[in-house]
Structures are given as C-alpha cells and as structure tokens.
Amino acid sequence: MSEKAIAVKAQKVEEIADQFKAAASAVVVDPRGLTVAQSTELRHQLREEGVVLEVIKNKVLTRAAEKAGYAELNDIFAGPSAVAFSNDDAVAPARILKKFADENEALEIKGGVVDGTIANIDDINKYASLPSREGLLGQLMAEFQFSIRSFAYAVKAVQDKLEEESAAPAAEASTDAE
C-alpha cells in the first residue's frame, strides 16, 4: 500500500475517532439487505433529527474506536457496519433506528455508545423508548407548571381562609356594638 493511501486511511481513522469523541451517541447497525430506497429513507429520517449515518470499513472503525477509548465496541464490528452519529440528541439515533428496524427486518442494530457509555442492543432498545430531549423538557416543564399551580392554589386557599376569619370577628364586633 502506498504512503499516500496509508495517510488517507490514518486521516479517516482520526476523523471517525473525533466523531466518536464528539458524539452524544453513536449507534452501530448492520445495513445488509436494505434496498437503496430503504437506505435513502433511513438516511432522510436520521438527517431530519441531525443524525449522520456513515458506512465505514470495519478496520477503520476498529482503529477509530480504540483511539476514541471504545475498544469494547470492536466485538460488534463484524460484517458490514454503519454508524449513526448524533452530536445533539443522545436518544435520536436509537429511537429512529429501532423504529426503522421494527419496520424493516433487514436492519440489525449491533450496539453503540450513548453519552460516553458502551451500550448493547438491550440498552439501545431502552434508550429508543425514551422521548426526545424536547419531549423530556416538555414533561419537566409540565411538572413544574403543575407544582407551581398547586402551590398558588394552596396560597390562595390560605389567603381566603384568613380573610374569612378576619372578617368574622369584625362582623361580630359590629353586631355587638349595636
């Protein structure tokens, strides 16, 4: 192999290692058996959520994973491999790939990395069941809103009770004075 080809591969390993390090999650799949239309549809769904899917040679993946500190992933780099990288939403790749794999048996999820932790197939499936970041923030805001509303109602009830109690002695005092 020429020095130029070796330099190109070394640069590719560096790029993929940097993607692993920067990613909120990276999910590895076996795309064997997907038609061109299915592959295009999958890439489109992933791209809408800011996820990039790359088909990468296993040797490059192995070296990049080791360089990024994820040598445990090397066991899943058998057969064709594609990696879905997401820098923003750690759950998006798992959610989209799981849904797509359920609809298309040809796609097999192998495992990956989520928030710096090695994730097996079961872990990926658990992450896939979580709502998106925006969904979780919405749920959190709804809980805050409910708590604040409940507190406001409690304060209003105490205020009303105090007003009734202070109004009652004043009414008694005015009837006694007559």
From Swiss-Prot:
Keyword check for Nucleotide-binding: no
Gene Ontology cellular-component terms listed: ribonucleoprotein complex; ribosome
Keyword tags: Ribonucleoprotein, Ribosomal protein, RNA-binding, rRNA-binding
The protein, known as: Large ribosomal subunit protein uL10
Species assigned in the record: Leuconostoc mesenteroides subsp. mesenteroides (strain ATCC 8293 / DSM 20343 / BCRC 11652 / CCM 1803 / JCM 6124 / NCDO 523 / NBRC 100496 / NCIMB 8023 / NCTC 12954 / NRRL B-1118 / 37Y)
InterPro entries for the chain: Ribosomal_uL10, Ribosomal_uL10-like_sf, Ribosomal_uL10_bac, Ribosomal_uL10_bac_type
Quaternary data: Part of the ribosomal stalk of the 50S ribosomal subunit. The N-terminus interacts with L11 and the large rRNA to form the base of the stalk. The C-terminus forms an elongated spine to which L12 dimers bind in a sequential fashion forming a multimeric L10(L12)X complex.
GN (gene name): rplJ
Function recorded in the entry: Forms part of the ribosomal stalk, playing a central role in the interaction of the ribosome with GTP-bound translation factors.
Gene Ontology biological process terms in this record: translation
Cross-referenced NCBIfam families: PRK00099.1-1
Gene3D superfamilies from the UniProt entry: 3.30.70.1730
Lineage: Bacteria, Bacillati, Bacillota, Bacilli, Lactobacillales
GO molecular function annotations of the record: large ribosomal subunit rRNA binding
Pfam families, per database record: Ribosomal_L10 (PF00466)
Family named by the database record: Belongs to the universal ribosomal protein uL10 family.
